[in-house]
A protein has these predicted regions:
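C-terminal catalytic/acceptor-binding lobe
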Residues: 1-11, 15, 163-245
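Short, Asp-centered acidic motifs that coordinate Mg2+ and/or phosphate
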Residues: 76, 103-105, 208
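Active-site nucleotide-sugar/metal-binding loop of Leloir-type enzymes
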Residues: 63-76
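Conserved donor sugar-nucleotide recognition element shared by glycan-biosynthetic enzymes
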Residues: 58-62, 194
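N-proximal low-complexity "stem/linker" segments adjacent to membrane-targeting elements
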Residues: 1-56
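Conserved catalytic core of nucleotide-sugar-dependent glycosyltransferases
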Residues: 66, 87-182
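Short beta-strand-to-loop acidic/aromatic patch adjacent to the donor-nucleotide binding site
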Residues: 73-85
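Alpha-helical elements of Rossmann-like donor-binding domains used by nucleotide-donor carbohydrate transfer enzymes
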Residues: 32-35, 64, 93
Length: 245
């Protein structure tokens, strides 16, 4: 599916959120962003870009970027980690999928920076042990990494409304910041801020979906090119898929 042909994205706006602890992004990411910035106006999309640099606590950086989104008029927040490479159409696809109000989180699945093809996502299975797809390629998930994640603005707004006690005063920026991304000890062990955020979004009624057709590069000493569909999903899909509208 070509998102720009199947959905009308005109008038939509997106906040590109870049947490970059070491004040730099990969050259490939810079080129990807430039290409998306060229493509977006052709689809009537407005862009804002925000970054938090030098913050060693990634959950704080993400929360600050959420507040930046909320102070903007943008419809979506797009988290992109500083070591992720993508194609401009990948963001257009996620925006198209995210036009469904139920799909609060839609993401590509990054590969870890290792020779083993390990991916950072937990898919959702029903009571019969079957996966759920939307009939157009998306797969429902329980949790996914924030490395390349689109979030509807309403997810943040409704989470804050449900939990006003999560706001805290950030002295450095002199603002009240929603603590939506956090680390937590659970029965499963130590849970990172990305998985906990997905749990919190699902608790207030939003769905989490992943697009296995998106191939992301993950930069390290070398580029670890991922293909979640080919490596993980498609080999297991035939006996364990249930389509939903």
């Amino acid at each position: 599916m070509q998102a720009q042909k199947s959905y009308d994205l005109a008038g939509k706006s997106i906040f590109i959120a870049l947490p970059a602890y070491d004040f730099k992004v990969s050259l490939k990411l810079a080129v990807s962003l430039a290409r998306f910035a060229q493509a977006a106006p052709q689809h009537g999309i407005d862009i804002q870009i925000g970054s938090i640099c030098g913050c060693s606590v990634v959950s704080r950086a993400r929360n600050l970027l959420v507040q930046d989104l909320l102070e903007s008029p943008c419809d979506y927040l797009m988290f992109i980690d500083s070591d992720i490479n993508f194609e401009p159409d990948d963001i257009l696809r996620l925006m198209a999928w995210g036009s469904d109000p139920k799909k609060g989180i839609v993401a590509g699945v990054p590969r870890t920076r290792s020779e083993t093809k390990t991916y950072i996502a937990n898919l959702e299975y029903d009571e019969n042990g079957e996966l759920t797809m939307n009939g157009m390629g998306l797969v429902r998930a329980e949790r996914v990494a924030t490395a390349f994640m689109l979030v509807r603005r309403e997810v943040f707004e409704q989470m804050i409304e449900a939990h006003p006690e999560w706001k805290y005063y950030d002295k450095k920026t002199d603002r009240m910041i929603p603590c939506l991304f956090d680390f937590q000890l659970t029965e499963e062990g130590y849970m990172g801020e990305d998985y906990l955020f997905c749990d919190r979004a699902r608790e207030i009624g939003f769905e989490v979906w992943v697009d296995p057709s998106i191939s992301l590069g993950h930069m390290g000493v070398q580029e670890y090119m991922g293909d979640y569909g080919r490596d993980v999903l498609y080999p297991m899909i035939a006996p364990s898929v249930k389509d939903v509208a």
